[in-house]
Amino acid sequence: HVLMSSVSDGFSLLSYKGVAVVPIGKPTLEGYRLIFRDASVWISYKNTIIYVAGTVGLGFVLNVLGGYALSQPTKGKGIMYGFLFVTMLFSGGIVPTYMVMNTLGLTGSRLSIILLEATQTFYLIFAAKAFAAVPLSTVEAARIDGAGHLRVMFQIMLPQAKGMFFITLLNTFVGAWNSWYNASIYVPSDKTKWPIQLFINEMTSANVNFLETATPNYSRYLIQFAVIVVA
């Protein structure tokens, strides 16, 4: 429906009430033209790629290092699990998080978005459980051969837990690509740092307001469908 609506005639689509399985009226690419003639959409795509790459990369490092540390038979591991579990159930909240970011001087920067979305407690515990499932005999054999923590982690344990990390990376990627809420809080006025989803949210809202005017251009009604396909 969304794809067919995005290439339909705006006036005909506005009066159509059913599900579009074929283009309504004369097919047109007007909605896509209106989007891509604006340089802001390309800037938003660039920002989204930066956010996704930074979030996935940093999240991978944090999950691997944190998961490996939690999987080791060290004292106080149960207490650490308890702290992590509490943070998974009860977050600090938007205002305290914003105050921390503001104190660190990160508000208004891309780094604030990346740090907030890099990892979740669930992924960290998931990584620890995956590392703990690696046979202890394999790890001990590697250490007898002189392997240190980094070699054991990356060459012995990580390959055996790659399925878990693939799922984690995929979820992190999807979450980072679709994220817009943090950007609306930490970079609300700097459109040069907006991700594509926040840009689409503003464009769709502006399009709705435009259609409520006395003499709307019905071609712009296509934007709300075209931007979904583009995203």
Specify the residue positions occupied by each region the protein language model found.
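A hydrophobic, multi-pass inner-membrane permease signature
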Residues: 1-231
